[in-house]
Amino acid sequence: MAMKLNALMTLQCPKRNMFTRIAPPQAGRVRSKVSMASTLHASPLVFDKLKAGRPEVDELFNSLEGWARDNILVHLKSVENSWQPQDYLPDPTSDAFEDQVKEMRERAKDIPDEYFVVLVGDMITEEALPTYMSMLNRCDGIKDDTGAQPTSWATWTRAWTAEENRHGDLLNKYLYLSGRVDMRMIEKTIQYLIGSGMDTKTENCPYMGFIYTSFQERATFISHANTAKLAQHYGDKNLAQVCGNIASDEKRHATAYTKIVEKLAEIDPDTTVIAFSDMMRKKIQMPAHAMYDGSDDMLFKHFTAVAQQIGVYSAWDYCDIIDFLVDKWNVAKMTGLSGEGRKAQEYVCSLAAKIRRVEEKVQGKEKKAVLPVAFSWIFNRQIII
């Protein structure tokens, strides 16, 4: 971990076939996707630089109102031009409704349990939307003080939330009609997750907040895109379209958030790279890390292990996202940085390669132990991870 790499070096992640199982972590040692990110901590200077409540933060984001209107709000779709969940579900007003449900269940019956565990986990993550909206509304400079402010930042947050709301609605209804999952246990998990809240470690700082959302939206895009490919592989073209449309939304949202940080890096590269480094040192906390169904205290780790196992999202994707953001924000080419900024620059530019080396060593040394895990979402049927 102490080894330094050239800041301009970008390593490509080894490609993984999503239809081939990735070696899972050793039994009893299931790892979070981000567990190897860093053991270092940000210095006090970082927190001085990013201290919440600075008047300059409000001034900066107020000055970017017009820019956000012209460059960020364009990534939203009007309600009239948006797909809705009912577009992909059986029509309850039709005489053919029962036949449509039967056809849907017929397509779903041969899809493996592993896939449904991941699809349920993705849906539960989407359903905790109130938590994510509240995170953005706590950030200085962009918060929606009244709940209906007309600023570009507040407008974006509300409209983004409205678009995202369709994702959980559609997946929830699909899973309900599929007959493959225990909806009551899923509903309990959703209630537990929303009730537990989430600390993203963004400290109400918009720099950190937008770095977090840039990372998360791209991760979610990757996850839904891969569930779409798997659904196609299993022969359910309708489900593939469902997941594909959700992935398309996530990619569009990721583009907007990434563009915001790109603008911040142009205006204030020092603060931006320090914020980026700070978030990566603290490790990006996945939105559903507090997932709980009333019995499995390690539910999130078990869910993510299955996601990695079937090729939906893994440590390799985490590394690819870091490299993507480093490149998109031109981190390696930043100049005029403070001493703290240069340290942050060096850290983030070499991080993905370090994680890959550690992960390759871990996977190379781990015994191929198996762990049968019962998931309440699929009526306590066991999956080997």
From Swiss-Prot:
Q: What class of enzyme is it?
A: oxidoreductase
Q: Which cofactor does it need?
A: Fe(2+)
Protein name, as recorded: Palmitoyl-[acyl-carrier-protein] 4-desaturase, chloroplastic
What the entry lists under InterPro entries is as follows: FADS-2_CS, Fatty_acid_desaturase-2, Ferritin-like_SF, RNR-like
Q: Provide the residue positions that the database annotates as binding Fe cation 1.
A: E126, E164, H167, E250
Q: Specify the taxonomic lineage.
A: Eukaryota, Viridiplantae, Streptophyta, Embryophyta, Tracheophyta
Localization in the cell? Plastid, Chloroplast; Plastid
Please give the chief subcellular localization of this protein.
plastid
Q: Which organism is it from?
A: Coriandrum sativum (Coriander)
Q: Which UniProt keywords apply?
A: Chloroplast, Fatty acid biosynthesis, Fatty acid metabolism, Iron, Lipid biosynthesis, Lipid metabolism, Metal-binding, Oxidoreductase, Plastid, Transit peptide
Tissue specificity as recorded in UniProt: Found only in tissues which synthesize petroselinic acid, such as developing seeds.
**Family per record:** Belongs to the fatty acid desaturase type 2 family.
Q: Where is the transit peptide?
A: 1-36
Q: Which GO terms describe its cellular component?
A: chloroplast stroma
Q: What is its EC number?
A: 1.14.19.11
Q: Which GO terms describe its biological process?
A: fatty acid biosynthetic process
**Catalytic activity of the protein:** hexadecanoyl-[ACP] + 2 reduced [2Fe-2S]-[ferredoxin] + O2 + 2 H(+) = (4Z)-hexadecenoyl-[ACP] + 2 oxidized [2Fe-2S]-[ferredoxin] + 2 H2O
Q: Name one GO molecular function term.
A: metal ion binding
Q: Where does Fe cation 2 bind?
A: E164, E217, E250, H253
Recite the UniProt cofactor note for this protein: Binds 2 Fe(2+) ions per subunit.
Q: Which Pfam families match?
A: FA_desaturase_2
Q: How does it assemble?
A: Homodimer.
For the keyword Flavoprotein, the answer is no
Membrane-traversing stretches? none
**What does the protein in this record do?**
Converts palmitoyl-ACP to (4Z)-hexadec-4-enoyl-ACP by introduction of a cis double bond between carbons 4 and 5 of the acyl chain.
